[in-house]
Amino acid sequence: YEYGQKHNIELQRAKQNIAYLSDCGYEIEHKVADLSSAMSLFHSALTSDEMEIPEGHYEEEQMKATVVPNRNAIFSSILYGYALSVALREECDVKIALGVHSGDHAIYPDCRPEFYSAIGDAFDLGNWDSEKISFHLPYIDGDKETILRDSLKSCKKLNLDFDIVFANTNTSYNPDSKGRSSGTSGADVERILAFYAIGRKDPVEYVKDWEEVLQDALQAQLVYHVTRENGTERAFSGKFDKHFENGEYRCVNC
């Protein structure tokens, strides 16, 4: 979707991945729906030049500024209408696969299981032949690490290069003019920590080198966990609030 997002580099990256998959022998039809005129009316840091993209941990309260009102309801509605059109035209059943995941549950209500259950029921009630359509949400209870581990298996099975596939993606909400990820938005931090968890360097380009953005993300995670426990002045080692452990003690913001 083109909806006036500041990170519309994701559209170019998607085209690059489609081209790569095509070169590997996979036939994929790619369509872009332009919603920029309508959604320019919405209030969100993702679409408004008057609002800054917040930085820090992806579950911090200020990340709510990145919510686009009713976005996934709009996206899902268009997808459902298109899927139903394909089902009727081709006389087949259609699954709508979405990558919503548990890492978004805290900040984005329209990524939660109950939202998709409710909106699926509404679409069923509001359409003829709705039995032909279903939602496939494989990561609704998983996080970005789950997605990456699954992607490693899928790329191997499909004979695809994992690094090429993920170099052709964008997660950052505030990439620079060259399309390089900032490493500072909540979405960046979540992605960086997921790659760290699987022991791989993120192939996407950042404004800083990988070691720097990784350390920044780990620091953001640490700050979040310490402050969440009301321990802003509590000494800690490297295990969040486990102050009884041996190690180097320091202030979280020093």
Language-model-detected regions and their locations in the chain:
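ATP-dependent adenylation/nucleotidyltransferase module used to activate substrates
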Residues: Y1-F162, D188
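Short, surface-exposed acidic
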Residues: E27-E29, L158-T169, Q219-T227
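AMP-forming adenylation/ATP pyrophosphatase catalytic core
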Residues: H101, K208-L214
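Short, flexible, mixed-charge glycine/proline-rich loop motifs
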Residues: F162-F166, N174-R180, K239-G247
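Short cysteine-rich clusters marking metal-coordination/redox-active sites
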Residues: S172, S182-S185, C251
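Iron-sulfur (Fe-S) cluster-binding segments and ferredoxin-like electron-carrier domains
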Residues: G179-W210
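A charge-rich, low-complexity, intrinsically flexible signal that marks solvent-exposed coils, linkers
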Residues: L218-N253
